[in-house]
């Protein structure tokens, strides 16, 4: 299928300005890397997502979904087919102690909405930069909390565009993983069950976690957060630091001097710089400590020709 035809058709389905050709994906990731998307769309509701999926299925066009790009490296060759950004699907409703949040809502914003309603349970998420969909996809967590602790169910869309409601058990949550890495479901919304709390106590906890994050993490540079999962009975940052890798740079990307578990884009780095540095760090740590670090960050897209 000719991508010009795809662009022209989808432009009749989505609002003006929400369909683009050859969009640079570095503009849609936190680390500011990534090549072009053949066709980039940003739906505003579930019906538009369904329309994109059905059209793509009809003509066998590959589809890639993006949240807010906080935990993904898109290769320098970009993404073929249709790239769907979910950042405009952001509704949040509160009923009693239940919050229902759509996939594109920032999990930080949801934690603040919980605070505004004196609800406790999402304080840990006050510094997680991802979207609700991304948080469920990888069972995001911090400071002893995880999304799986407060999620009760979620609405998903199948690869055929069908809506389904899944209970928490169906997610098969583990450490920084869920069933979504191995199926074609698209997370549309999540239902969180929280508890009534005291505003001042919730805010104090969030302020404390925010201070810890800002004092320990290199927020002044583009990054994708923690690059590696925590190995059993150890910490990735500690192993990287003890391997003498802080400040190690490949191209424009370096292992952060502030937090060894982060890799930061300090000088117009590329996706390949990140990938090469990740492999170098994995190789060095394994040679020194016998520990193979597992990536937390996702890598998608095509290599640059």
Swiss-Prot record:
Keywords carried by this UniProt record: Cell cycle, Cell division, Cell shape, Cell wall biogenesis/degradation, Cytoplasm, FAD, Flavoprotein, NADP, Oxidoreductase, Peptidoglycan synthesis
Pathway: Cell wall biogenesis; peptidoglycan biosynthesis
Any one Gene Ontology BP term: regulation of cell shape
Keyword Lyase recorded: no
Catalytic activity: UDP-N-acetyl-alpha-D-muramate + NADP(+) = UDP-N-acetyl-3-O-(1-carboxyvinyl)-alpha-D-glucosamine + NADPH + H(+)
EC code(s) of this entry: 1.3.1.98
Membrane-spanning ranges: none
Residues forming coiled coils: none
Protein name listed in UniProt: UDP-N-acetylenolpyruvoylglucosamine reductase 2
Gene: murB2
